[in-house]
């Protein structure tokens, strides 16, 4: 998806859009994580605001349903003191047949400063970034199967928070990887940050073999895939993106690939368990694990606000 010149960066190598973790230099990833750390304390203040985006208009354009991502983006923008506009797609002109670019052109005429976009079509945020005015910034909140960069970044923040260093880590990503934009964003970021052992775990129908070309170890046996893992990232089954019988049943899937306390015992003693949500208990993870001592699923949500604040504040401060 990336052109020869990375469209996310200006000529000085500064971040002006966030479209994917693919192709982002380690220095940019580290800048985002370091900046997020400075925003964590804002959550604990009586007045949870900083003035960095005061006077800026942020438009949330969610063409797909979302709870955590949309809410945390709205909270993040408001804590940066931005004016936030949530476009109701079902009631907008897009529902009447208006093209994506016409929608963007009209919103740009309202002096938008930033678009946060979730879309079912891979590449939609790239298209918007290519056609919007130079002063307008675009953040990809998930596009098709392609990328979910802020989820990838908050996952990296979570890993760094608990593990301190990426070198030497063993990270297992388990579940429906073939349909997962989160998995792709995580793999690109983990690779750039120097994680030497990345594993993709799941049935053959849900794990693309070409991940091996990215240096990922593909495992179809759960026990092998999570053995001695320092980090386990569980993914839900994306039934809405599946066509045909890719799995025998949810029960059979849980038996083979659901994370239980017994299976977790195969991982490193201080392993952390992550999940981008929404969780399907009893399908990819049992409640004793999701709510247990190894789980950092709820802290991920908290960190997501700080990470999205970091992304928006950084790109808003850089010129195209």
From Swiss-Prot:
GO terms for biological process: 'de novo' pyrimidine nucleobase biosynthetic process; 'de novo' UMP biosynthetic process; amino acid metabolic process. It comes from the Bacteria. L-aspartate binds at residues 96, 181, 236. It catalyses: carbamoyl phosphate + L-aspartate = N-carbamoyl-L-aspartate + phosphate + H(+). InterPro entries: Asp/Orn_carbamoyltranf_P-bd, Asp/Orn_carbamoylTrfase, Asp/Orn_carbamoylTrfase_sf, Asp_carbamoyltransf, Asp_carbamoyltransf_Asp/Orn-bd. Carbamoyl phosphate binds at residues 68-69, 118, 148, 151, 277-278. One of its GO terms (cellular component) is cytosol. Its EC number is 2.1.3.2. Catalyzes the condensation of carbamoyl phosphate and aspartate to form carbamoyl aspartate and inorganic phosphate, the committed step in the de novo pyrimidine nucleotide biosynthesis pathway. HAMAP family: Asp_carb_tr. This is Aspartate carbamoyltransferase catalytic subunit. The gene is pyrB.
